[in-house]
């Protein structure tokens, strides 16, 4: 059933508002996926805070104009699904990568991360980016290491003195 003009404008507005608040967008061709596979993809996307939208290419191009997601224009062809992530730049890539492990019919065409286009062959690199919580944990570990070493060094001196005195007494 064809969409009327008002419905098309509503879709463009929804996708545009979604694109404006997203830090990354993924474009994948879903040709050959069954309904069950598509449902699994959508549920894994929901778990990862990724919004998936199936949109006609002409409407997607109109919606992505003047947003950071505009960089994916070149790959908007064929039956596509757009994945938007508002929090984690690597979330869309991780969802697509994990889904492709079991379903070879999903073909990732490219990713847009902070206004930069990333080719599909670099999906693994983006998917391996740490999440915000992981990055904070790594940073805190790196910051605490010198402090822990200093504390161990300061504690070691009295321990050595005690051992020397104990050895002399024996």
Swiss-Prot record:
GO biological process: translation
Record flagged with keyword rRNA-binding: yes
Key words, A-Z: Ribonucleoprotein, Ribosomal protein, RNA-binding, rRNA-binding
Pfam families xrefs: Ribosomal_L10
GO CC aspect terms: ribonucleoprotein complex; ribosome
A GO MF label: large ribosomal subunit rRNA binding
Entry keyword annotation includes RNA-binding: yes
InterPro entries, alphabetized: Ribosomal_uL10, Ribosomal_uL10-like_sf, Ribosomal_uL10_bac, Ribosomal_uL10_bac_type
Biological role: Forms part of the ribosomal stalk, playing a central role in the interaction of the ribosome with GTP-bound translation factors.
Subunit structure: Part of the ribosomal stalk of the 50S ribosomal subunit. The N-terminus interacts with L11 and the large rRNA to form the base of the stalk. The C-terminus forms an elongated spine to which L12 dimers bind in a sequential fashion forming a multimeric L10(L12)X complex.
Protein family membership: Belongs to the universal ribosomal protein uL10 family.
UniProt-recorded name of the protein: Large ribosomal subunit protein uL10
